Amino acid sequence: MKLTKILIASTAMAAVAGMANAEAHMANDMTIVSWGGAYQASQIGAYSDPYLADHPGLSIVYDESSAEAVAKLRAMNEAGNITWDLVDVEAADAIRLCDEGLALEIDADEVLAAAPDGTSATDDFGDMLVSDCFIPQIVFSTTFGYRTDQVPAGVEPPDSACDVFDLETYPGKRALNKRPIANMEWALLCDGVAYEDVYDLLETDEGQARAFAKLDTIKDQTVWWSAAAETPQLLADGEIFMGSTYNGRLFSVIAEQNQPVGMAWDWQMLDLDGWIIPAGLPEDRLARVLDYVMFATDTQRLADQAQFISYGPARASSAPLVGKHAELGIDMGPHMPTDPANGANKFVNNYAWWADYRDDLDAKFQAWLAQ
């Protein structure tokens, strides 16, 4: 018995010493790049606060530059000075960064925790692993919110992305993202193009011209946003009637802020968001990031994030653990973009297509905006 206690104590001391030794070789500060607003707050609540509780000597700084991540990482790489440690990006940007060698390739089963039942990370994330550099977190959608108190009398509220183009039925200012993704698809879909033909058509000059012509019909009534928090604020202030943003942002303004805002789910664009690790980090910074990522993407942590925002967890094992909102106590399941009741029509961001065409269409879109 005495020997057993000694062995157990020795083993425990060795484990503690091992953890301390590993911690000693990790950086004591970390810069995480995200999107700000309700989404970043959900990451802090589900990932960073619990991680910091276990690592009191660590300092985490958030940089709200995810929208410019590709351009800024290119510039950092050119200058040979990578100041970011972990970057939250959409899947299409992760593919581009990976293709350009600006993001670290990972082995998911080495870097990410297995599910509680032993299912490998590769199997648990499944099709969400769209790039060798991408570490999935959430499924979200880009959809539309509208002011319920500005719906004309006797008119049904908008329920589709296509209603944004109907200025006659729904007069008032719009808000759209200042980039081509989703806007180009909506323009063609709402101009009568079948979804299965959208991307083939967008590869042609004629298809692009048709999309821009459709967007021209609302251009002078549109506020163009670059930060996802802008549309919820414009809606809350009553400065627009209808605008696009991420579904979690709309959930926040509706459920948490009690603003007179509704959601039009039909033709929402489903998307993936997650982490990339910049290539070329020093060993101590990389060790810290890998430790944080394994913690922040485990089954429980991804389920915990859904307590703060209505984005679906990217792990299959996390979905059954999604429960009620941390403060409001409401069931979060019906507020997820993947709920079958939320829109008869939806489409998934064509990540590979946008990775190939993004730079070209970005330039054309900005030139069109400047006209």
Residue ranges and their predicted role:
Residues 145-150, 188-189, 272-285, 304-307:
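A bilobed periplasmic-binding-protein/Venus flytrap-type ligand-binding module shared by bacterial periplasmic
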Residues 1-22:
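Gram-negative bacterial Sec-dependent N-terminal signal peptides
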Residues 278-345:
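Mature extracytoplasmic/periplasmic domains
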Residues 24-96:
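Early extracytoplasmic/lumenal segment of secretory-pathway proteins
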Residues 93-96, 242-260:
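A ligand-binding cleft/hinge motif common to bilobed small-molecule-binding domains
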Residues 37-44, 83-84, 89-230:
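Extracytoplasmic ligand-binding site segments that recognize negatively charged/polar headgroups
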Residues 208-217, 256-279, 328:
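Periplasmic-binding protein-like
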Residues 338-371:
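Conserved C-terminal helix/tail region of periplasmic/extracytoplasmic solute-binding proteins
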